[in-house]
Each structure stands twice: as C-alpha cells, then as structure tokens.
Curated annotation (Swiss-Prot):
Entry protein name: Xylose import ATP-binding protein XylG
Gene: xylG
Domain ABC transporter residue range list: 5-242, 259-500
UniProt-annotated binding residues for ATP: 37-44
Pfam families documented for this protein: ABC_tran (PF00005)
Subunit structure comment from the entry: The complex is composed of two ATP-binding proteins (XylG), two transmembrane proteins (XylH) and a solute-binding protein (XylF).
Lineage: Bacteria, Pseudomonadati, Pseudomonadota, Gammaproteobacteria, Pasteurellales
Organism whose genome encodes this protein: Histophilus somni (strain 129Pt)
Protein keywords: ATP-binding, Cell inner membrane, Cell membrane, Membrane, Nucleotide-binding, Repeat, Sugar transport, Translocase, Transport
Membrane topology qualifier: Peripheral membrane protein
Entry annotated with the keyword Ribonucleoprotein: no
Enzyme Commission code: 7.5.2.10
GO cellular component terms given for this protein: plasma membrane
Domain of life according to the entry: Bacteria
Catalytic activity: D-xylose(out) + ATP + H2O = D-xylose(in) + ADP + phosphate + H(+)
Subcellular location: Cell inner membrane
Amino acid sequence: MTKLLEMKNITKKFGDVVALNNISISLETGEILSLCGENGSGKSTLMKVLCGIYPSGDYEGEIYFSGEKLTAKNIKDTEEKGISIIHQELTLVKNMSVLENMFLGNEITQAGITNDNKMYLRCKTLLEQVQLDIDPNTKVSALGLGQQQLVEIAKALNKQVRLLILDEPTASLTEKETDILLNLIKGLQAHNIACIYISHKLNEVKAISDKICVIRDGEHIGTQLAQGISEDDIITMMVGREITSLYPHEPHDIGKEILRVENLTAWHPTNTHIKRVDNANFILRKGEILGVAGLVGSGRTEMAQCIFGSYVGKYQGNIFLNNQKVKINKCAEAIANHIVMVPEDRKKHGIIPIMSVGKNITLSSLSQFCFGKKVINEPLEETIINQSIAKLKVKTSSPELAIGRLSGGNQQKAILAKCLLLHPNILILDEPTRGIDVGAKYEIYKLINQLAQEGMSIIVISSELPEVLGISDRVLVMHQGKVKADLINHHLTQEQVMEAALKE
C-alpha cells in the first residue's frame, strides 16, 4: 500500500484553548483507520481540519494527500481532491428524492441542460454499488436511517471519493443495518478507498479496522494495529485510567414488588390492526435493575411509554403500584406517582437545546423553587443547579451555557439530573448510553448502580446486549410486542437472550 494521507504536527487553538496539540497521523491507500476518544477529545476538530472546515492557515502543521501538500480553503476543495465526510447528523434533504440529493450541486449537464436520463442511470449504478435496491426517485423521507447512510456513501462515491470519513455511522442503526454498512466499508477497500471510522462502539472498531488511533484531550496517545490491541487497552488509552470493568455492578438489596403490569396491549397510532405491545405482563421490585432486551421494533419503547403515559396510540391494561391499581393516561400522572422516564431521543424529547444547562435541569421541577406558585426563588434554584451538576459530574464551563453545546454524554447526565429532582421511585431509561463515549457510559452505569443501592427501581431499555447483561439483575426479553421471557441474570449470555427472543 502507498501513503495516502499524512497529517503532521497539527495544532489548533480557539483563543487560549489548545484543542489539538501537535497531532500526527497517517493512512495508507485502502486502509481503515478507526479514531477513538471520549467526546471532547479532539476527534471532530481534527477531521474538520482535514476536510477544510477549518481552512489552511487557521491551524499549525501540514497535511499531505497523495504526496501533495493540501491547502484547502473550504470543504469543496477537499471534496475535489477525493475526501468526503459523512457526519453523524445526516445532511440529506428529506423532501427531495435520492437522485436529487445525489447530484445536488453536482448535476450532469449537456449544453447547459441537466441530463435527467444520465443522472438516473448513474444514480441506479451507485445505489447498486452500496447494495441499496430502491428507485432513485424515492423521497429520502421514506427511507430508514440505515438506507439514508447508504445513500450518503453512494453520494460520496459519486464524487470519486478516495478517503471516506464516517462519524458515528451506526449510532442509530439496527444490528442488521450495521452489518450491511460494515460489510460495505470493508468492500470499499477492494477499490482502494481508505476510511477513517469514528465510533464509540469498540466491538465495531475492532472488527473493521486495520489500525486504531486514540486521541485524549487533544493529544495523540497512540496508534496500534487492531489485531494487537484489546478493547480494555483502548478504553485505558481513551480515559487515561484503567477501568477494571466497564459494567460496575455493586451488590444491592432487592425488596418487595413495587410495580406490576398486567395484560398491557398497545395499538399502532394510525393502524389499529397492528399491536405494538401484545398482552405484556411483568413485575419490578424495589431496588431492582430490570433490563429490557429485544430487536428494534419489539415493543420495548412503546411498553415503557404506556407506563409513563406518553404513548400516543390507544392502549389498555392494568398498572399496579405497591399493589394499588393506578390510572396513568399522561406524563403528569406518572410523575405524580413517582415514575419518571428518560426518552430514547434526547435531542428531540429530552432537552431544549437553546436553553441553558441549568434551566434544562430545573425545567420539570420549577414548583419546588417558587414563592407561592409564580415567583421563582432564583438563589435556591441556582444552589440546586450547582448541586445537581456536581452530583452528576456534568462537564460544562457554566450552568448558563446552552445545553445544545454539550457533548452527548453530558447532555444525558443533565437529563438524569432533571429526572432525579422529581424524586422518582421508578426510573425508566430508554437507550441511556446511545451515542455516548465510553467514559461517560461508565459514569452512567455507576450512577444506575448507586441509585439501585439507594432503593430506586430502574428499567433499562437497550439495543446493546452486553449493556443489558452487564448492569441488570433480571432481563425481560421482548419480540414482536410480546414478553417472550423473564430471566434471572445469573451468568446469562447473549445467545440465551436471542434464543429466548426468537423461539416460538
């Protein structure tokens, strides 16, 4: 293989803050390099330097691509050289077709007129290359996230990409979609296309990479061959300390039944012939961590939403708290019964991005800080905010900072802080560590254990089986809306859980 990319002694500052400090990395033609590091470590900043988002002259150091010095003024310059980046937040225009997105700003023309036939055939060929069997005229809004990722890659191939950068590409994908994407990336190697792969999912990193590069606090910690480094080694390099177990599971007392769900059925919001939850029954005990496992679409989230009163469709069944039947038709009624839920999509349902960290934390519990019912006791609110930030270890320069500027892990910790101010007895966590770096995951796992030790009952819904098995006392297995198994987590394996989910 020949040298494709060299980044030499890259230093990037924002005022007096050094974001990147003398980082050097290299990449061969057709090689897959995974870039690992906690949120805020400098991974994205380094890629923005490479892609011309931070132009030449805005940083110190040199970049060479195919042996030539790269002096990009913007991202278009690097795209013309064959460097393409696909961000975690996809940039496709949802109300346009796949074809229109593919050639947006890059139309095939003849005598100044767009050649629709050539673009259609070219689009069809590119979609076949990424194993996507759809009509080019399909609206992007009609595609799933996995299909949209493949369209983004096809779009990059249309630009004659030689280096493809993927930032957290599988964060919102199903296991099947992830397998398709990883196989495609490996297949691109045969066409001498190199890849920089950014992910917190270390099993994927190990499976796909030729080399693994770790960045911490803007420093290059090291680059090693993937086959010569373990996941534990990567974690230690990322966080700067040894984590003996990613899933700290401290002993805690499990008490009497606190929640019982009987015959819970929920129908699709717009098609009542489809059951999202089908006659679900289970119990939850005081101080217990109950994991809920199952494939995407198994009804896990819908079941939790019914318990929390946030499900938008029709549902029926019985919910008992401390052996007393309760009616929960809206979130306020759940909160009044000391049930709180952290939603799956934190950006859409968990935070108000333009509001401050502090105001997001106290948003659901303002009545606790009021004189009478209308006037906020600001000194008391400020004290509670600072205590919550310290307790949850939310990393922020100020409580006044807009929460949208925090990393995913710190946003999630702020949401947890908000929920804990409601003093729940039952805490429901839906995908609590999705898109979060390994250090923040560890802190959230520790918090879950601490809360269980204090007597809180916790339901954890996760698509990551190692996570479910690592932190749960008991595992509820769901498939196609049904509770297929209720398993004590005594050395449970992933195979046992999947077998329980799929058995008839």
